[in-house]
Structures are given as structure tokens and as C-alpha cells.
Amino acid sequence: TPFNDREMLELFLTAQENGRKYPTEAEFEAAGFNLIDLEFARSHVRPRAILKDKSKNLYPNIYENRNLWMNIPMGVGKAIGGYPSSTFSDDTYSMWNYTNLFGSWNHGLFQAPGSWVDAAHKNGTDIFSGIKFFESWTPGSESAKYREMITAKNPDGSFKYAEAFINCLMFFGTDGINYSWEDTGYAD
């Protein structure tokens, strides 16, 4: 899939090196993207402020400025996971207006469905796109290779992929990333 985290960062790094924030349509197509499919992963809705109206709370004494972070899998992972399908449970999340921050842990970093990001933003919810696991227990885990790539630095000491990473998140409209802290891979 062209949504491979490494390939996506390289694509956005190339755009940055050519003086642009985002790849061109031709660059996306050359990387294997169908432009119509790419739009399923893009959000086109700017975030709204979260609705806070104590008079509409079922329990009026609940702390008005509560912050709920919902961190659950979407749908069935990379197989469908929130993209259009005939499986109702893959497409449904109905608690956006109660959630301040949503994080899904079964998509790649840049692969959350744009419709989910749109729904989140319409309800004042920030949304993380997918997750990156840095774990040693999964056979074939490539976390060491990814860690080596993401910590690469430019000659001036800045991180090589930092701006490309931010531009990629901005292009897709997501508000951040989700990292699993369950292993020792964060030491560096």
C-alpha cells in the first residue's frame, strides 16, 4: 500500500526539498496512489470548538471542562477500518461530541479515514491518525529501522523528517500521531 509510513515521509521530504509543502498529483500517482482513493484519507473540515453547554448535560453536576481521550481501534484495522464497506460496525462511532481527543491504534500514521477526521472536527474533537508501535516482541518488527530513519538528522542538527512529518499530517488534516509506549524503544 502507498500508505507505508516510510514511503509517505520520503514523498513529503522530496516535496520539501523541492520547495513545496505537499507532493504534486503526479508525484502521488508515481508513488502508487489513486487520487480518488487518496481523498478517502483526507479531511476537508476545519476543527470547530467543542460544544460546552452544561444545561444540555444528562448529569448537570459533571465537571464542564472534562477532557475525554478515546483511544480504541477503528473497524477491523488495515483491512477496512472505517473506509466504506457493508459492515456497519466498521463505519460507526457516535460519541464524537463527548470526546476531546480520539486516537485509533489500528491504522498507520497517515491512514485514518478522512470521514472520521471530518466527523471529529465537526464536533470539536481532535483526532490522531493511526499509531506507531515501537515494540520488540512482534516477530519481524521493523521498529528499529523506523527509529533509525525518524531520528536521522540534517548537517545543521535538525531532524531530517520533522517538517515532512508535520506537512503530511497537515495535508491529511489530522491533529497528531499516536505512539505506543509499551516497550523500551523510546530510550533514544
What are these regions (language model features)?
Residues T1-S86, D90-T92, W96:
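N-terminal module-boundary/linker segments of secreted carbohydrate-active enzymes
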Residues N61-D188:
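Chitinase-like catalytic core of GlcNAc-active glycosidases
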